């Protein structure tokens, strides 16, 4: 017989203390850290622990004893179910305070480096309908809440098969965390212009009422698989369908659906589709077909136009992206004489945005299609002082590359969430630019990278930027300035001393361990071992 698991604790009358990572809140009971979702600081609750680790617990609210004065009513009826917008119950001014603290905490505790006073976080101009892109999944397995399930007709034999039958309804919406094959249907999403809701709801109603098959993720069949909607500040709209052709006639049915959408929504200037037979919903490696209009839309930023295709990366909050790039340009402090390297350039938005203030800008990006867009964006805007290269950053950005193209005066880097590869950091340090502007979507990995560069660069300015209201995500821009030679020598000396002390401590610990093992082998008591020493 297996060992009985000890029941997880039920904790009463707990006050939620603060906002923590990933949209959860934090409290402490008997020096144990507890993470709780869907709370706000000041809530008094009863908790059921659902997961217990050595250093922390995770719990869910069983009962609200007193709701915090800070709490606000979420605007969205899907709050707490769809998986997005986890901070809708927290007023926006409290959200950005929490994000400011998050950046300060991560740079201080992880980076452990000297920091200047942080600038106040730059809040988003819009807190609703701020996104320019949303992707919706389509499924023949609708997710039901407990309340919705209770309202469904009950069967006498509530077997696994009958439960599956009850879930067998079509849906378009978002994937549910922990139930990857099910979709929760969305009636209204507040993240994008309401036309997005109209398009999605029309597609569902038409397809469902005309007996279109919706995709089954486990069985991998069903015609309607996924849809991505983009819009731009030029008023253009893009819709990309992912279909899964199973049988003869599916392609014709897909064409009929797209024609219905095109007739109903003349605002759509780019309507594209792809037959995706893969095991996942990404289409970056697939060739798309054009049904109507152009294969792209345009975004405007100052006097620049940026071409955005279905596979392009473009910041999803257009208005706030402009303010983010303005901060990066300000920190770069260009005079027109500088050679600038723009690392992880994407579609060349930052590179082209700063090009008029630089002598030359070289952009590097992993995705070849993004580099093609970057080149097109330079051509569209008649920018002639940019060069773009596609490939893995650590393979492209080498000391040989810098010898060939010139030592940069300024480096702007905007890496993915994982941060920069150590090889990339080493090449940057060898290149020794006067300034580095580090744009990050993950202050934790940014802090790690700043620590690796601390011997040679000091942090001169920090500007958090909120790109995603109602979520825990935050961007951060850091200006690094090269230290003088005296500072560098002192920093390197301090590092050597720390490494020496750490090595000595490790050696002493190892010697003590070996001595203990020898004593055990000789069967010496602690007193005899001490006397022998």
Cite the ranges covered by each PLM segment.
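Rossmann-like S-adenosyl-L-methionine
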Residues: 2-13, 18-23, 248-533
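Hydrophobic beta-strand signal
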Residues: 46-48, 135, 341
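Extended interfacial segments that mediate partner engagement and assembly in macromolecular machines
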Residues: 62-74, 80-213, 247
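Short, solvent-exposed loop/turn elements at beta->coil junctions and helix N-caps
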Residues: 119-126, 217, 224-226, 463-467
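Terminal RNA-binding accessory module
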Residues: 1-78, 387-388, 395
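Short, acidic/hydrophobic/Gly-rich beta-strand patch recurrent on exposed beta strands
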Residues: 25-30, 173-176, 240-242, 374
């Amino acid at each position: 017989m297996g060992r009985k698991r000890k029941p997880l604790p039920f904790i009463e009358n707990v006050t939620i203390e603060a906002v923590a990572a990933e949209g959860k809140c934090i409290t402490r009971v008997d020096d144990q850290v507890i993470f709780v979702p869907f709370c706000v600081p000041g809530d008094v609750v009863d908790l059921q622990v659902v997961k217990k680790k050595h250093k922390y617990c995770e719990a869910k609210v069983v009962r609200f004893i007193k709701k915090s004065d800070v709490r606000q009513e979420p605007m969205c009826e899907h709050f707490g179910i769809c998986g997005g917008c986890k901070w809708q119950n927290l007023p926006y001014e409290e959200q950005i305070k929490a994000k400011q603290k998050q950046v300060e905490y991560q740079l201080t505790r992880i980076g452990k480096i000297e920091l200047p006073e942080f600038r106040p976080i730059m809040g988003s101009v819009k807190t609703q309908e701020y996104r320019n892109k949303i992707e919706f999944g389509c499924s023949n397995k609708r997710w039901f809440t407990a309340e919705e399930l209770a309202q469904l007709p009950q069967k006498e034999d509530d077997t696994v098969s009958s439960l599956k039958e009850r879930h067998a309804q079509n849906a378009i919406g978002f994937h549910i965390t922990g139930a990857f094959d099910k979709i929760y249907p969305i009636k209204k999403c507040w993240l994008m212009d309401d036309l997005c809701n109209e398009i999605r709801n029309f597609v569902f109603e038409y397809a469902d009422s005309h007996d279109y098959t919706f995709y089954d993720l486990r069985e991998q069949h069903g015609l309607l698989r996924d849809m991505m909607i983009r819009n731009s500040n030029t008023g253009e709209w893009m819709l990309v369908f992912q279909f899964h052709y199973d049988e003869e006639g599916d392609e014709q049915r897909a064409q009929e659906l797209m024609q219905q959408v095109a007739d109903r929504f003349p605002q759509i200037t780019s309507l594209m589709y792809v037959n995706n037979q893969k095991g996942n919903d990404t289409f970056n490696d697939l060739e798309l077909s054009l049904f109507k209009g152009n294969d792209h839309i345009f975004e405007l930023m100052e006097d620049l136009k940026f071409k955005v295709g279905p596979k392009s990366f473009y910041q999803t909050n257009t208005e706030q992206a402009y303010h983010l790039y303005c901060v990066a340009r300000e920190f770069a402090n260009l005079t027109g004489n500088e050679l600038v390297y723009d690392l992880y350039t994407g579609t060349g938005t930052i590179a082209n945005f700063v090009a008029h203030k630089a002598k030359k800008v070289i952009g590097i990006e992993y995705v070849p299609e993004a580099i093609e867009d970057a080149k097109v964006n330079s051509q569209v805007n008649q920018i002639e002082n940019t060069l773009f290269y596609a490939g893995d950053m650590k393979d492209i950005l080498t000391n040989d590359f810098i010898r060939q193209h010139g030592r940069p005066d300024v480096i702007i880097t905007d890496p993915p969430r994982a941060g920069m590869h150590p090889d990339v950091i080493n090449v940057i340090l060898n290149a020794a630019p006067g300034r580095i502007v580090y744009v990050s979507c993950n202050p934790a990995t940014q802090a790690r990278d700043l620590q690796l560069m601390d011997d040679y660069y000091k942090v001169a300015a920090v500007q958090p930027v909120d790109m995603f209201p109602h979520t825990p995500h935050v961007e951060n821009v850091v200006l690094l300035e090269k230290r003088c030679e005296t500072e560098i020598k002192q920093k390197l000396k301090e590092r050597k001393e720390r490494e020496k002390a750490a090595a000595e401590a490790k050696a002493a610990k190892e010697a003590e361990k070996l001595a203990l093992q020898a004593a055990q082998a000789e069967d010496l008591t602690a007193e005899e071992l001490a006397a022998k020493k």
